Amino acid sequence: MSNQLNTMDIKEILKFLPHRYPFLLIDRVLDFTPGETLHAIKNVTINEPFFQGHFPVQPVMPGVLILEAMAQATGLLAFKTMSEEPSNDALYYFAGIDKARFKRVVEPGDQLHFEVQMIKERRGIGVFTGVAKVDGEIVCSAEIMCARREISK
């Protein structure tokens, strides 16, 4: 049995996600098992553009962006699960969210750890659970759906 981790650096992430600055919210994938789980990180710095207005005196990462980062992690897991190479023909879209809960704020200097798990997939729609943590403490949890859709040309 191998202990080798399946990782993704930023170059590989850029091949799978269409997002670019300032909306690419996954920095590295630490490990994944297709069809099961993916662990990723986002390094949160004071240089993030959203901190200019949210909030200048007490910078806090918007919760919707934590959820978006979690959705990006599920998109990566979906691609890896379906053994699909990225193309200009299809994308995995954020399709739904349930049971989103926020437990604490995320501030500059924090490192967000995302753990997403595939629950089921049927006809191009995947259902996932996700947890975001900082220093082992849960920041956010949610159930996320993403859907594979052809891109019209």
From Swiss-Prot:
<keyword id="KW-0444">Lipid biosynthesis</keyword>
<dbReference type="Pfam" id="PF07977">
    <property type="entry name" value="FabA"/>
</dbReference>
<dbReference type="InterPro" id="IPR013114">
    <property type="entry name" value="FabA_FabZ"/>
</dbReference>
<feature type="active site">
    <location>
        <position position="54"/>
    </location>
</feature>
<keyword id="KW-0963">Cytoplasm</keyword>
<keyword id="KW-0443">Lipid metabolism</keyword>
<comment type="function">
    <text>Involved in unsaturated fatty acids biosynthesis. Catalyzes the dehydration of short chain beta-hydroxyacyl-ACPs and long chain saturated and unsaturated beta-hydroxyacyl-ACPs.</text>
</comment>
<dbReference type="InterPro" id="IPR029069">
    <property type="entry name" value="HotDog_dom_sf"/>
</dbReference>
<dbReference type="GO" id="GO:0006633">
    <property type="term" value="P:fatty acid biosynthetic process"/>
</dbReference>
<dbReference type="GO" id="GO:0019171">
    <property type="term" value="F:(3R)-hydroxyacyl-[acyl-carrier-protein] dehydratase activity"/>
</dbReference>
<dbReference type="InterPro" id="IPR010084">
    <property type="entry name" value="FabZ"/>
</dbReference>
<comment type="similarity">
    <text>Belongs to the thioester dehydratase family. FabZ subfamily.</text>
</comment>
<dbReference type="GO" id="GO:0005737">
    <property type="term" value="C:cytoplasm"/>
</dbReference>
<dbReference type="GO" id="GO:0009245">
    <property type="term" value="P:lipid A biosynthetic process"/>
</dbReference>
<keyword id="KW-0441">Lipid A biosynthesis</keyword>
<dbReference type="GO" id="GO:0016020">
    <property type="term" value="C:membrane"/>
</dbReference>
<keyword id="KW-0456">Lyase</keyword>
<protein>
    <recommendedName>
        <fullName>3-hydroxyacyl-[acyl-carrier-protein] dehydratase FabZ</fullName>
        <ecNumber>4.2.1.59</ecNumber>
    </recommendedName>
</protein>
